[in-house]
Design a protein with these regions (language model features):
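Residue-level detector of functional hotspots within protein domains
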Residues: 10-14, 64-66, 85, 120-122, ...
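Generic signal for short, ordered secondary-structure residues
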Residues: 21, 43-46, 105, 121-122, ...
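Acyl-donor binding region in acyl/amide transferases
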Residues: 96-162, 169
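Glycine-rich loops and low-complexity Gly/Arg-rich segments
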Residues: 13-17, 50-54, 104, 115-117, ...
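A generic secondary-structure signal for well-formed alpha-helical elements
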Residues: 4, 8, 23, 46-54, ...
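A conserved beta-strand-loop-helix scaffold within acyl/acetyltransferase catalytic domains
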Residues: 1-111, 158, 190-202
């Protein structure tokens, strides 16, 4: 927090107080603390979010079960409950000194709860565990306004058709430059003092 501009520190404290005033119980869970009820609730949140935003749920219910079976000790969930009902949650992975934020969903609208569950609670967990990096995922201007550094996100693809591959390579050459300019623009107005002064992308 000390690295942020005073106005952003004040904004974050205000956001966190607002969420606290809802009276929700927010739990940070990993390992054996993750139960079937959490996975079931997260599945419904995920479906609700994809129905509203993307239209296609590319993860299946069994994917969540398999992740729990194979990676339980690397899963980190932040779940919010109102009385006896789960109302929102995040599904994240961690390894070593990094947390990778992945899925958010909610059954009800609580302004600011997304930031609490997806960012602030993950940062709290990272600090408490001596972790260095919270990777909040691709996209979302609101991340940069809360102290995350804008940086490139990479993926790998192979296209068999030579003409298609050449056309996409040309497009990506132009997009790469545009994205670098966008990243520098975000970091140039970052609320983190040293990022803003250096326009850092790492």
């Amino acid at each position: 927090m000390a690295d942020l501009r005073a106005s952003k520190r004040k904004q974050i404290r205000k956001e966190r107080r607002k969420v606290a005033d809802y009276g929700l119980e927010i739990e940070t869970l990993t390992g054996a603390d993750i139960k079937d009820e959490h996975i079931e609730a997260m599945w419904h949140f995920y479906r609700n979010t994809t129905a509203r935003k993307w239209g296609e749920a590319y993860l299946k219910r069994r994917t969540f079960d398999e992740l729990v079976d194979r990676c339980r000790d690397r899963l980190l969930m932040v779940m919010a409950r109102d009385a006896d009902r789960w109302v929102a949650g995040t599904f994240n992975l961690f390894k070593g000194e990094k947390i990778f934020g992945r899925y958010w969903g909610a059954a009800a609208d609580y302004p600011g709860l997304h930031f609490e569950c997806c960012y602030y609670r993950l940062i709290d967990y990272a600090i408490a565990g001596g972790m260095r990096i919270v990777e909040a995922g691709a996209q979302g201007e609101h991340k940069f306004l809360r102290g995350f550094v804008a940086k490139p996100t990479y993926s790998a693809h192979w296209l068999a058709h030579p003409s298609g591959r050449a056309a996409i390579e040309r497009y990506l050459d132009g997009e790469r430059e545009q994205m670098q300019n966008t990243i520098e623009g975000y970091n140039g107005v970052s609320p983190v003092k040293d990022v803003r002064s250096q326009g850092r992308t790492d």
